Curated annotation (Swiss-Prot):
GO CC, alphabetical: plasma membrane
Ranges that cross the membrane: 66-86, 114-134, 150-170, 202-222
Functional description taken from the UniProt entry: Regulates membrane-cell wall junctions and localized cell wall deposition. Required for establishment of the Casparian strip membrane domain (CSD) and the subsequent formation of Casparian strips, a cell wall modification of the root endodermis that determines an apoplastic barrier between the intraorganismal apoplasm and the extraorganismal apoplasm and prevents lateral diffusion.
PANTHER family referenced in this protein's UniProt entry, alphabetically: CASP-LIKE PROTEIN (PTHR36488:SF11), CASP-LIKE PROTEIN 1U1 (PTHR36488)
Gene Ontology biological process terms in this record: cell wall organization
Name of the protein in question: Casparian strip membrane protein 2
Subunit structure as annotated in this protein's UniProt entry: Homodimer and heterodimers.
Keyword set includes Transmembrane: yes
Residues annotated as signal peptide: none
Protein family per UniProt: Belongs to the Casparian strip membrane proteins (CASP) family.
Length: 228
C-alpha cells in the first residue's frame, strides 16, 4: 500500500456543507420592543377662580349711587301722586239743609279741572311704578345711556302733565276758598269743609310729586352729560 507525502483532507462529520450559490443563513433575533414609558400623570387642572366683582367699583361708583338715588326718588314720588289721586276721588261731600229733601252736593267730577287733576295723578303714579324696573336696570348697568335717555324723556312728559294738572286744581281750590266778588261767586268751603280739605291736601301732595320729578329730570340730565 503506497503512501503519499500530500496531506489528507479531513472533513469533519459534524460540519454541515454550505449550499452552493446561496447566502449563508443568518439567525435573526427579534429585538424586544423598548419598554413603554410610564404614562405621565394627567396635568392638574385648576378650576378658574371666580373673582368677585364689587357692586360699587371705583370706575362707576358715582353712577351707581346716582342711579340708586333715582330709584329711591321714584318710590318717594309715587306716594304723593297716589295720595293726591285717592284724596281727590274720595272728596265728594253732601250737605243737608233743614231736611233730607234739600241736599247740596260737592263732587270733584263737577269741576273739569279736578277731574283732569285726578286722572293726571293716577297716570303719574302708574308711570312711576312701571319705571321702577327700568331704574333698577340702570342701577345694575350704569353704562346703559339709552335707557337713561328714555327715562329722562318720560319724566319730562309726566312732570309737565302733573304740573299743568296741579296748577289747574290749585286755581279751583283757591276759588272754592276765596270765591270771586266780581263774579258774585261765594266761597263754598265754609259749608263743604271736607271737600275743601281733601282737595287742598291733594294739591299740596301733587306739587310735592312735581318737585321730586323735576329733581329726577335734573339728576338724569346731569348724569347723561357727565357720561357723554
Amino acid at each position: 500500500m503506497s503512501t503519499s507525502d500530500a496531506a489528507a483532507t479531513v472533513i469533519p462529520i459534524d460540519d454541515v456543507p454550505r449550499q452552493h450559490g446561496k447566502a449563508p443563513a443568518v439567525d435573526t433575533v427579534t429585538a424586544a420592543p423598548p419598554p413603554l414609558a410610564a404614562a405621565a400623570p394627567p396635568a392638574a387642572t385648576t378650576a378658574p377662580r371666580k373673582t368677585r366683582v364689587p357692586f360699587f367699583r371705583r370706575a362707576d361708583r358715582g353712577s351707581r349711587c346716582v342711579a340708586l338715588l333715582d330709584l329711591v326718588l321714584r318710590v318717594a314720588a309715587f306716594g304723593p301722586a297716589l295720595a293726591a289721586a285717592i284724596a281727590t276721588g274720595t272728596s265728594d261731600e253732601t250737605l243737608s239743609v233743614f231736611t233730607q229733601f234739600f241736599q247740596f252736593h260737592a263732587r270733584f267730577d263737577d269741576f273739569p279741572a279736578l277731574l283732569f287733576f285726578m286722572v293726571a295723578n293716577a297716570i303719574a303714579a302708574g308711570y312711576l311704578v312701571l319705571s321702577l324696573p327700568f331704574s333698577a336696570v340702570v342701577v345694575l348697568r350704569p353704562q346703559a345711556i339709552g335707557l337713561r335717555h328714555l327715562l329722562l324723556i318720560c319724566d319730562l312728559i309726566i312732570a309737565a302733565l302733573l304740573t299743568a294738572a296741579a296748577a289747574a286744581a290749585a286755581a279751583i281750590v283757591d276759588l272754592a276758598h276765596s270765591g270771586n266778588q266780581r263774579a258774585n261767586w261765594v266761597p263754598i268751603c265754609m259749608q263743604f269743609h271736607g271737600f275743601c280739605q281733601r282737595t287742598s291736601g291733594a294739591v299740596v301732595a301733587s306739587f310735592l310729586a312735581v318737585l321730586v320729578l323735576l329733581f329726577l329730570v335734573i339728576l338724569a340730565a346731569f348724569t347723561i352729560r357727565k357720561r357723554c
